[in-house]
């Protein structure tokens, strides 16, 4: 039996309004619980279009057929008009998710975090996180205990900023296994649960065809030597590719692969490490990567 942490990122208004209810229904039918990370502020994701001038991002958009994958409402959100606020407009959906799954903060403004957080000072970052946590807690009526940085944009600055909120864990980086990042003070910080497996948009059209993806991913899961964690997106697996996701769950069950919330992957003893800026194939720009230092 192989246990895989299932992380669901919700980046946009449409992903929340349409994708999350579909995913909740699918997960219920398969008796699966997951960790769902919500963006709760304005949907400005269309402002990423300026990145098309970067060849790596343009190629990713072309090979993943982004217009079909996400829809033009997502690709243009917040460009010619102010982005719609996601959280309170979809409060009932978010509350329903929190009844059955582990719910955490993805971002206040996903676009702002992904595009600008690397240049923010620490107080700006703390204020942004606080705004998102406060909004999500108002919606679900209980404390938020986990978070996942938008676009995996995380480094030591992010690690230090999030310590102010005393969360149970964060999932801010890519890596191999849960660990505790060292703080500037030399003490271990809040547990990190890295994503270990590629996402759909990172590999489709580059490493694998869409129709072969599920078999390819299950093979990667079985070969994962660390603690497997897989991320899906409400805008992808909850919308255009929901049938592919259903097929993945069926095939996973047949192969003895089970999915769980990320918190179930935590153990009492975790290695020490750091979150450093790095790059991975299929994703444009830098992102947080795990660097192991020792054990604690």
Swiss-Prot record:
Documented EC number(s): 3.5.1.n3
Pathway: Glycolipid biosynthesis; 4-amino-4-deoxy-alpha-L-arabinose undecaprenyl phosphate biosynthesis; 4-amino-4-deoxy-alpha-L-arabinose undecaprenyl phosphate from UDP-4-deoxy-4-formamido-beta-L-arabinose and undecaprenyl phosphate: step 2/2; Bacterial outer membrane biogenesis; lipopolysaccharide biosynthesis
One Pfam family of this chain: Polysacc_deac_1
Disulphide-bridged cysteine pairs: none
Keywords, alphabetical: Antibiotic resistance, Hydrolase, Lipid A biosynthesis, Lipid biosynthesis, Lipid metabolism, Lipopolysaccharide biosynthesis
Protein's UniProt keywords contain Lipid biosynthesis: yes
Transmembrane segments: none
Catalytic activity: 4-deoxy-4-formamido-alpha-L-arabinopyranosyl di-trans,octa-cis-undecaprenyl phosphate + H2O = 4-amino-4-deoxy-alpha-L-arabinopyranosyl di-trans,octa-cis-undecaprenyl phosphate + formate
GO BP term (any one): lipopolysaccharide biosynthetic process
Boundaries of every NodB homology domain copy: 2-260
PANTHER family tied to this protein: 4-DEOXY-4-FORMAMIDO-L-ARABINOSE-PHOSPHOUNDECAPRENOL DEFORMYLASE ARND-RELATED, GLYCOSYL TRANSFERASE-RELATED
Family: Belongs to the polysaccharide deacetylase family. ArnD deformylase subfamily.
Stated role: Catalyzes the deformylation of 4-deoxy-4-formamido-L-arabinose-phosphoundecaprenol to 4-amino-4-deoxy-L-arabinose-phosphoundecaprenol. The modified arabinose is attached to lipid A and is required for resistance to polymyxin and cationic antimicrobial peptides.
NCBIfam families linked: PRK15394.1
Protein name per Swiss-Prot or TrEMBL: Probable 4-deoxy-4-formamido-L-arabinose-phosphoundecaprenol deformylase ArnD
């Amino acid at each position: 039996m192989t246990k895989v942490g299932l992380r669901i990122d919700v980046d946009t208004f449409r992903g929340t309004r349409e994708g999350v209810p579909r995913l909740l229904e699918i997960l219920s039918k398969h008796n699966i619980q997951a960790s769902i990370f919500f963006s709760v502020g304005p949907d400005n994701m269309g402002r990423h279009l300026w990145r098309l001038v970067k060849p790596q991002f343009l190629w990713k958009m072309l090979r993943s057929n982004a217009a079909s994958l996400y829809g033009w409402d997502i690709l243009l959100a917040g460009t010619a008009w102010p982005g719609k606020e996601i959280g309170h407009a979809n409060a009932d959906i978010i509350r329903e998710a929190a009844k059955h799954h582990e719910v955490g903060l993805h971002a206040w403004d996903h676009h702002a975090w992904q595009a600008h957080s690397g240049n923010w000072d620490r107080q700006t970052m703390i204020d942004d996180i606080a705004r998102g946590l406060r909004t999500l807690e108002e919606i679900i009526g209980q404390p938020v205990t986990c978070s996942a940085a938008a676009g995996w944009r995380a480094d030591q600055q992010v690690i230090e900023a999030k310590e102010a909120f005393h969360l149970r864990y964060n999932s801010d980086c890519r890596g191999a296994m849960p660990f505790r990042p060292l703080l500037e003070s030399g003490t271990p910080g809040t547990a990190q649960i890295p994503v270990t497996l590629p996402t759909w948009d990172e590999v489709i059209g580059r490493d694998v065809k869409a129709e072969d993806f599920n078999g390819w991913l299950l093979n990667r899961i079985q070969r994962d030597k660390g603690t497997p964690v897989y991320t899906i997106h409400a805008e992808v697996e909850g919308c255009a590719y929901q049938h592919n996701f259903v097929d993945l769950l069926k095939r996973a069950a047949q192969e003895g692969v089970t999915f769980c919330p990320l918190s179930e992957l935590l153990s009492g003893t975790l290695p020490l490490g750091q979150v450093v800026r790095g790059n991975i194939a299929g994703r444009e720009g830098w992102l947080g990567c795990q660097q192991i230092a020792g054990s604690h």
